[in-house]
């Protein structure tokens, strides 16, 4: 009753209505303040995540070209997931069975590798794509030594094909299970039989016989190291124990064969990179336009610099191998990357 009487007085009614408006405004400001606080927390988390990414050692590369721009130009947008397979940023379909840690990745899209993904980092992706960009306009031919499941054959082959180039990709691999993965991956990513060649053996500077560790299940061990130039005694022991497969050492000259130009030579042979490059240097200088090399020690990195310093080749990408230094001896945890251009065969 008293409130009703009071509101009948114009001045009191205005005061009451003003109070209500202020309460509404206050509640709105409180809500907005909470929203701003939530946004601030989200931004703080995002900044922390970005700072963590920027501290990644995978940014410790040096290049004489814009690596990220090279990658962005090849990035495929509006990709659609494929059930049972992971699809990466280049549109390559990957079977999760090749690595146990990919078991739950079927039907997913793997994002742009900034600065890296499970397969490679900016340095290696960009260096390999640099070879694609500088290949002849109508063709792309590459060799992957130590091809595993055909990772670089598939990725660079798909990238080159998307530019309208005819492609031919060649791989050498010692593990038969991994070689079967490569056959399946190439077929899955629409490579015809005439567009690829696979060799079962060990890539080397010269022909011979090698021993390659045998594993019970393909995909569980990557980075197995062969025994080059196995003696008769070693071969007999390997055959008796079943520990190793006896495989041919396939020379780079035999892999290249009659081809006149190799646009990309990708070398990742678990420690034999420097020996192969040094032993095949005249052939490489004559026929290879670009090399991307996975380096498995500081010693190999230095040897490659010494070897290539005697040539006119130019290094375009360098990211050192990473070591864990918390133990008594440094332990290699990530291979290094070097990208080399042959001015005699590449556009300047």
Model-derived segments and their meaning:
Residues 1-27:
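N-terminal membrane insertion elements
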Residues 16, 23, 27-348:
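Phosphate/nucleotide-binding beta-alpha loop and adjacent structural elements of enzyme active sites
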